[in-house]
Amino acid sequence: MKLDELKTLIRDVPDFPSKGILFRDLTTMLKNGEALQTMAKELADIYRNKGVTKVVGIESRGFIGGSILAYELGCGFVPARKPGKLPAVTIKKAYAKEYGVDTIELHSDAITSDDIVVLHDDLLATGGTMRACYDLVKSMNPKKIYVNFIVELEALKGRSVLPSDCEVTSLLKY
């Protein structure tokens, strides 16, 4: 399967989770084995020669692609979670959302100064969650941080929220 064919497998769900929103449902792509293999290969090909040591997947849909990417690269996977979900000592970052404030956490020992990290989430919309995760990982002083998405909604300009010196990639753009 070719990369551009993946878009045909993503379901559009109007008015979800609220009126006026067009939700891009990746589960219809993920349930197709050939599409999942294509996604895995395409994600991994971006980073194969970059020395990546950790992939951070953002709760919860970022766990799917992030785990696959870590497996394909033969590196570690680190979950970025909502508050209270990680059992050991954590560091956290609060960030603004449309209707309030949310927080993201990592184990305090998850990233070291020797790590080259890919931050992964399924979809880039406004960029707030990824920016918070980026700032949190940056505070742990890794060698390098890359940012990756399966889908990017370009009209929402989420890239503009991310640092300009950050290499951002997405497999599919709408």
What does each of the following model-derived ranges do?
Residues 1-174:
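PRPP-associated nucleotide enzymes
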